[in-house]
Design a protein with these regions (language model features):
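Short microdomains enriched in Cys/His and/or Lys/Arg
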Residues: 63-73
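Axial heme c-ligation environment in periplasmic c-type cytochrome domains
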Residues: 44, 50-64, 77-104, 117
Length: 117
């Protein structure tokens, strides 16, 4: 095997390993975000794919899909709560989430709350 063929083989293996690692990380992050939704009582008002009291996570993702400030807006809404974005029923504040968890959670919502099954 010549040098370039061997290098190409190693490059392809490294690329495949990187893609697999990203997939595993995304699945782990999705599971953690789903657990945060459950632990913080978000699922009392929200579901992944249907409106309960508040909008579904998928509806939120769709509404803000093209908004570059969506992540900051959602983080603020989760931390401070409020009303007016989706109706008259106010969302309670949830100020106990860490910055890291808040970033993970809002990212998951904006991706449409992918399933961890």
């Amino acid at each position: 095997m010549n040098f370039f063929a061997q290098q190409r083989k190693y490059f392809l293996l490294a690329a495949l390993f990187s893609l697999f690692s990203l997939s595993v990380q995304a699945t782990t992050d999705d599971a953690k975000a789903a657990a945060l939704a459950k632990q913080n009582a978000c699922l009392g008002c929200h579901a992944v794919d249907k409106k309960i009291v508040g909008p579904s996570f998928q509806a939120v993702a769709k509404k803000y899909a093209t908004d570059p400030a969506a992540s900051v807006f959602l983080k603020n809404k989760i931390l401070k709560g409020g009303s007016g974005s989706w109706g008259v029923v106010p969302m309670p504040a949830n100020a106990k989430l860490s910055d890291a968890d808040l970033s993970l959670f809002t990212g998951w919502i904006l991706r449409g709350a992918p399933s961890t099954n």
